[in-house]
Amino acid sequence: MKYVGSKNRLSKELVPIIQSYITKETKGYLEPFVGGANMIDKIKHHNKIGCDIHKQLIALLKYVQNLDNELPKTISEEEYNNVKKNKDEYEDWYVGLVGFCATFGAKYFGGYARGFKEDKITMRDIPSESIRNIEKQRKNLQNIKFMCGNFLDLPKELIKNYVIYQK
């Protein structure tokens, strides 16, 4: 998923380093600031936890995990503005989808995303591109436990012998 501060472009270098710390004794892998899940989705371990305090982000990631749940093909500027002004009237996952996928620069509700293709004439459908990125990531999110909250509130005994990656 496109996300401000994403480490996706660095994952080819970082994942092997992180993976090298995961041994047979490792009980799990934790990302306390999971963001767009662009690192955790590439780590190999049977017990992965992605934590974040952003309620709509975690709701979106959980929604996307369910392969039966459908996502819209795109998000219009009118829909973006309606959701931005009336967040309480929509489900959290949908607010997260609109806030991240239809926003310029993946900055949560930082302005509707617009852009042009390389010909500088044809408009791009950036929300549609972002939603397709999430669809591609979907299968890699299946075995991750997403939790909304401050990772400091996790019981220390729960995360003992975990590899923890903090961005």
Give the location of each predicted region.
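S-adenosyl-L-methionine
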Residues: 1-29, 33-34, 38-43, 96
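Conserved proline-anchored active-site loop of SAM-dependent methyltransferases
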Residues: 14, 29-43, 50-55, 101-104, ...
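Intrinsically disordered, low-complexity segments enriched in small/polar residues
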Residues: 1, 27, 78, 106, ...
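Short amphipathic alpha-helix with an adjacent loop that forms part of the alpha/beta core around
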Residues: 19-21, 154-162
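Short, well-ordered coil/turn elements that cap or connect secondary structure elements
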Residues: 24, 43-45, 139-141, 159
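Class I S-adenosyl-L-methionine-dependent methyltransferase module
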Residues: 46-148, 152-153
